[in-house]
Design a protein with these regions (language model features):
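A short, compositionally biased
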Residues: 19-24, 115-121, 195-199
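Short, acidic/charged, Gly/Pro-enriched secondary-structure junctions
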Residues: 93-140
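Solvent-exposed loop and beta-edge segments used for protein-protein assembly and interaction
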Residues: 84-88, 115-117, 151-153, 185-187, ...
Length: 282
């Protein structure tokens, strides 16, 4: 995709058929919350837009499942002993052009929008149906420019990143009361219980019921496998005291894609379900 006009304050970056199939908009959200629109299928009023993603500018940026196989007892095939989803890498090849400022200043501003330390920025892909996918991305490196341009001329630039989560996330769904959950996505979803801190109880898909005593403050219980019911406050700080009481009582809950699981949530509990995907295009 070649910009139709380089000079002036507006560059048309409307998409063409076949480019980023199924996507409507691609953007980057930096840790401060600023949204950098990089590409769109419809003409975008790019007043103020300084970073553009051309056709062919998206490299890698998709997850993969690493299966551990073992021989079967019979003569045919193999069985799966386990699996994991490792972190993945990606790279964006971009064009930068200053809007009401020299391009080199826009380039510097764009670089400051990325970080190698938490909180990371997010790459977001919105589909034509308005469905969002996002990945938390850690800066791994920038390309070095061959020269520093003067004025508002176009500048080529690339940024490499790593997604430590190993997946793309979808939009959070929230449930209360009796829940029959059918897991979507490509991978088991991220499950969390948002608890208002009042005395209540929850029955898990395995059939076990856990009672929660009042603690007088909102908490989040992470049901992801490996976290074993870790309890944090709204800012993500671990509540060691509350967690120690429930450690060994609440385990991880893993629901395979397409599997149906039933929860019974008492008053003050909300189940938050975040689907996981291997690719933003799915």
């Amino acid at each position: 995709m070649i910009p139709k006009r380089i000079a002036g304050v507006h560059t048309d970056t409307s998409g063409v058929p076949g480019m980023f199939e199924g996507a409507a908009r691609i953007s980057y959200v930096d840790p401060t919350g600023k949204v950098w629109v990089l590409w769109g299928t419809e003409p975008v009023d790019s007043q103020g837009q300084e970073v553009f993603l051309p056709e062919g500018g998206w490299d890698d940026g998709e997850a993969a499942v690493d299966f551990t196989e073992q021989e079967t007892v019979g003569r045919f095939g193999a069985g799966v002993r386990g699996w994991k989803v490792p972190a993945f890498d990606g790279e964006l090849s971009l064009w930068i052009k200053g809007d009401k400022r020299p391009t080199v200043q826009a380039w510097q501003r764009w670089q400051r929008a990325w970080t190698a330390f938490q909180p990371f920025g997010q790459l977001r892909v919105m589909s034509e149906a308005g469905v969002n996918r996002y990945a938390n991305v850690q800066l791994r490196g920038f390309s070095k420019p061959e020269f520093f341009p003067r004025g508002d001329v176009l500048m080529e630039h690339s940024v490499s990143y790593r997604c430590l989560d190993g997946c793309w996330f979808g939009e959070v769904e929230r449930f209360t009361g009796n829940v029959s959950l059918s897991a979507g996505g490509d991978l088991p979803p991220l499950l969390k219980l948002r608890w208002d801190g009042s005395a209540t109880s929850v029955r898990f898909p395995a059939g076990n019921t856990v009672s929660l005593s009042s603690i007088g403050a909102e908490r989040i219980i992470n049901l992801d496998r490996g976290y074993m019911g870790q309890i944090t406050d709204a800012d993500g700080n671990v509540d060691s005291q509350s967690w120690s009481v429930l450690r060994g009582v609440i385990g991880g809950v893993e629901i395979a894609p397409g599997e149906v699981a039933n929860f019974k949530l008492g008053a003050g509990l909300t189940l938050e379900v975040t689907p996981r995907f291997l690719s933003p295009w799915r």
